[in-house]
Amino acid sequence: MIPVFLAAIAVFLPLTSGHIAFWHNSMYGFNVTEQTFPYDNRPVVPLQNMTFKEWWFHNHLDYPPHPGDFFELPAGKPAMAELACNKGATTWFNSSEGGNIQNGDDPCPGSPPSEYHTTGFDDLKGCALAIAYEPDVTKIKPEDFTIFSVNQTCVWYRFTDFQVPERMPSCPPGGCHCAWFWIHSPDSGGEQIYMNGFKCKITGSTSNVPLAKPKVARRCGADPDHGKPDAVPGNCTYGAKQPLYWLQQEGNNEFDDYIAPPFYNDLYNFKDGAQNDIFIDSYPHGIPDPSPEQTIIPTPLDAAVISNATPAPSNGSCSSRPPSSPVSSSAASTTTSRSPRPSARGFRRSTGEKAHTGLPRKSWTQSRKMRYVF
């Protein structure tokens, strides 16, 4: 009787759909549903082979947030985001179609990790936040966004910390625009990119040094799955980098093969945490042109030295020491909580999966024969 009873209950348990989105009331498309567009364009839907209008800001520019709704980014501290398969799994459930289905730190209640495109913790490839210091969203171009924070355990936790560089300058009147980006492992589902745009502002700024002009990131890390066991540091892009625009009909800045996607991790020199070398004075001796043959590896000036020489804005100050616990950037109250943890190599949530066998993966030609044609 018990198995039958449990099976009957399971029928009524709310299951979330796959895929992931950044959820906050500052985002574009916060209330977009499956019926809003002629096609399914919910914030969680992945982006692949789309026109520029369709993938840029997820085609949600006509669905802006309310004036005054911003995602706060505390300089020198972590900003806590909520990543989930469904708005109902977040503190914003009261405006979701299915009600409250929160389950602690689970980003996709009722679904296995394959629903958010990973075979397990060791298969995570990272996600990132980018910023453009422009309040008018219609003026922003893809090359205006700069990646300022990376979390290499994304997506694994619903509550995901993004460390904000201490030297981030204040936003102009009207605020900044930010976007969340994610590209998942090729070992779990078809390839796409994810982008959710939102309005944001820097709080507690103590610097007025602007960001450098971002450049296109280059593949330079160790890539044993594709026959490159060693990193090639000379081929890396150093300093400010653009997001990875990939696999669309137009607007791409990355052209990797469908089965060798770019990632927000060491493969493209996106280190875990705050990207502290994105400012115009980060490399006072310049950055050499990257290439596989380049032997000069630039070193950014020590942030502490720069901070001592940087005048603070006159409109306020902020302690440069990060707090012992994360700062929530959500204005909504939550019934769940969790302890702070490192963004990479953190505690692993049990999934009931078998331990990694240590067997080598198949080569890309063995594992998939599909090739994406641009």
UniProtKB/Swiss-Prot annotation:
A molecular function GO annotation: monooxygenase activity
Glycan-carrying positions: N31, N49, N94, N151, N235, N315
Example of a GO cellular component annotation carried by this entry: extracellular region
Record carries keyword Nucleotide-binding: no
Protein's cellular compartments: Secreted
Region Disordered, annotated ranges: 306-374
Function of the molecule: Lytic polysaccharide monooxygenase (LPMO) that oxidatively cleaves xylan with both C1 and C4 regioselectivity and that specifically targets the protective shield made by heteroxylans that cover cellulose microfibrils in wood. Catalysis by LPMOs requires the reduction of the active-site copper from Cu(II) to Cu(I) by a reducing agent and H(2)O(2) or O(2) as a cosubstrate. Cleavage occurs only when xylans are bound to cellulose and not when they are in solution.
Protein name: AA14 family lytic polysaccharide monooxygenase B
Provenance organism: Pycnoporus cinnabarinus (Cinnabar-red polypore)
